[in-house]
Structure formats: structure tokens, C-alpha cells
């Protein structure tokens, strides 16, 4: 399995509006990349294009030099998983069964040992035995992360590509840090790539290996956090005053103060 997931000249238009405008990028194993930008910048659309859930008007994506639509869906699902903003299955299964769904590309038989290992890894073991629809929004997000990791077989340290759309939106502060710390730990092992849509610039600053800043469907800045998170640039693209500081002299942190007049 090649170590790159690439997109070339992606353009996507809907209702006369260009949501993704000639975007090219390359994603490597062993890194955590975040997509940031104001509302309407095209972050979620780009994520859907990267994963093949949307078809671009022009351009395309490839894994291991092979276009996504040339992969057999079951085989592709062994290497690429997606965690959406919201996921409400039409059946009220127990947590273990929801996580076990992630193993569908591999087997039709239950794999309780793998499910339990992933539940432990994601801090979801206390949720075992509960009905999915009875969980809070944050608990459901954590279970969906466990499902995606089970799908990719991350406990087996395989090449894998995980795409997450605002995975921290319903989480409290502790679980936001836990989720991103886990992703960082897994990517550092060198097998997993994580591409994450985030609105919280502070989280992006603290955990990203690389940041892509989008505006009006284009990548307007990309690089390490120290390069992208510049106060003047963020104020320009977000239309708000931004405070940028340093933590331990190494990592930038960014927070909004007030909109620009």
C-alpha cells in the first residue's frame, strides 16, 4: 500500500456556486492534518470529495496511485473510513453492535475481542451494553470514532486513512483532548493518517502536524501551525480580530476577540 492519498484539481459546483475551487493536496501516513476556515469555506465539502462521497465536476482523488472509483468499495473501506458530523442509524442497537458494524468490510462474523479492544482504546468501554439512541451526542461521537477505528483495523497497525468532520463538536473539554490525543498517538505510530475538520483554532494549533486554511473553496494557506496561524492572516480570512500566543515556546494558540468593524 502506497503512503499517499492525493487530490488533483478538485472542483465542485452546486446551484451555481463553486464550493471547491481547483484544490490539489497530498496526504501522507503518519500525520494529523486539520482543515480550518470560516463557515462556508468548503471544509466539509472538500472532506466529502476526498472520501468519494461526492463526485467532483473536475479533478479526482487517488489512493496508491489508483483513482478512488477504480477501487472495489469493500476493499477501499478497509483502508479509508469516515466519521461524519452526525450519524443516526435507523436501528437502536447496543454500542458493541454499532462498533462491530465497522468490521463489515472484513468479516460477517462477530469479532468481540477487536470490538472490546477499540472500545478500550477510545474510552467507550463504560458505554458497553447501552443502547445507541440513549446516548448523549458526545457519547455517540465517541462510539462512531470507535466504529471507524474498528473498520480500519488500527489495533493491527495497518495502513489506514481516517477522515473526521467536526469530531469534537459535541464533546466536553476532557473528551476533546482525549480524542485528539488518541489520534495524535495513532498517527505517530506511522500507519494512520487523520484528516480532521475543526472549528476550534486552539485545538488545531495544539494537535496538528499540518493545517490547511480554506476560504471560498480554496486553500489559501497551508503548513505547520506556526506558519498558518498568523494573527494578521487569520484576521483577514476570518474577518475577526485574533489573538495568537505561544505555549511552552513551541506551539501557537489562537482565539478570537471580536469581529472586525
From Swiss-Prot:
Its EC number is 7.6.2.-. GO terms for cellular component: plasma membrane. It is found in: Cell inner membrane. InterPro entries: AAA+_ATPase, ABC_transporter-like_ATP-bd, ABC_transporter-like_CS, P-loop_NTPase. Keywords: ATP-binding, Cell inner membrane, Cell membrane, Membrane, Nucleotide-binding, Translocase, Transport. It is a peripheral membrane protein. Its main location: membrane. One of its GO terms (molecular function) is ATP hydrolysis activity. ATP binds at residues 37-44. Pfam families: ABC_tran. The keyword Translocase applies. Residues 5-241 form the ABC transporter domain. The complex is composed of two ATP-binding proteins (HmuV), two transmembrane proteins (HmuU) and a solute-binding protein (HmuT). Belongs to the ABC transporter superfamily. Heme (hemin) importer (TC 3.A.1.14.5) family. Part of the ABC transporter complex HmuTUV involved in hemin import. Responsible for energy coupling to the transport system. This is Hemin import ATP-binding protein HmuV. It comes from Enterobacter cloacae. The gene is hmuV.
Amino acid at each position: 500500500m502506497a503512503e499517499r492519498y492525493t487530490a488533483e484539481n478538485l472542483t465542485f459546483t452546486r446551484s451555481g456556486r463553486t464550493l471547491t475551487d481547483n484544490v490539489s493536496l497530498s496526504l501522507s501516513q503518519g500525520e494529523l492534518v486539520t482543515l480550518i476556515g470560516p463557515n462556508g469555506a468548503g471544509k466539509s465539502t472538500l472532506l466529502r470529495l476526498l472520501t468519494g462521497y461526492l463526485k467532483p465536476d473536475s479533478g479526482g482523488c487517488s489512493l496508491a496511485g489508483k483513482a478512488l472509483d477504480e477501487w472495489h468499495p469493500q476493499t477501499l473501506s478497509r483502508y479509508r473510513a469516515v466519521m461524519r458530523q452526525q450519524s443516526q442509524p435507523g436501528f437502536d442497537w447496543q454500542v458493541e453492535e454499532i462498533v462491530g458494524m465497522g468490521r463489515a468490510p472484513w468479516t460477517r462474523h462477530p469479532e468481540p475481542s477487536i470490538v472490546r479492544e477499540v472500545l478500550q482504546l477510545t474510552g467507550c468501554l463504560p458505554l458497553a451494553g447501552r443502547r445507541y439512541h440513549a446516548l448523549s451526542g458526545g457519547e455517540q461521537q465517541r462510539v462512531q470514532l470507535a466504529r471507524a477505528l474498528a473498520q480500519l483495523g488500527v489495533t493491527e497497525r495497518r495502513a489506514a486513512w481516517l477522515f473526521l468532520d467536526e469530531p469534537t463538536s459535541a464533546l466536553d473539554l476532557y473528551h476533546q483532548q482525549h480524542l485528539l490525543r488518541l489520534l495524535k498517538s495513532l498517527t505517530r505510530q506511522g500507519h494512520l493518517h487523520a484528516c480532521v475538520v475543526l472549528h476550534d483554532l486552539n485545538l488545531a494549533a495544539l494537535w496538528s502536524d499540518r493545517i490547511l486554511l480554506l476560504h471560498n473553496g480554496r486553500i489559501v494557506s497551508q503548513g505547520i501551525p506556526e506558519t498558518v496561524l498568523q494573527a494578521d492572516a487569520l484576521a483577514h480570512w476570518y474577518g475577526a480580530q485574533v489573538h495568537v500566543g505561544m505555549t511552552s515556546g513551541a506551539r501557537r494558540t489562537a482565539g478570537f476577540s471580536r469581529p472586525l468593524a
